[in-house]
Amino acid sequence: MGGSPSTREEDVLAAWLSIDPGRRPGDIAGEGAPIAMGATAAWLFGIGEVGPSPYEFCTPERKQTKRPNLIIRKRRLDSNDVAIVSGIPATRPWLTVVDLIDSGEDLSLVANVLADALEKGLVEDEGALKKFVDARGAKAGMPAGASLYDSLTRRREE
């Protein structure tokens, strides 16, 4: 069937559909569509060395789940911050990097996601990404004035 996701993405698509059972496969437009984020988005883009599970999505309205491998966050995103990957809406790579930092992901894994996103040309404005990442430096344990972005890009080079 044309446009159907490959086997690789089937579990993510199933999780995506379970958030909004009335939505049909391929119905990615419209208000309230769940959006893959964090490690799930990175995995969909094929950046970094992260797995998709637990599946993490955001929706503009609060939703709950009893599935232990599914995280749903309440969050409104601008349509410019979302891309369609294998038929599934996902945060763009720059925002995925920021989300991974905000969620406390291991910085070596974040460095790999960042490096792959840059290498594949998936970051449209590296300067803006640097500002967003550096703004999170203190949270990530960086000394005052140090660049978290530079630290992450150096980690990959080592």
Question: Where are the regions a protein language model picked out?
Answer:
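Short gly/ser-rich loop at a beta-strand->alpha-helix junction or flexible surface loop bordering the NTP-binding
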Residues: 1-92, 99, 103-131, 138-143, ...
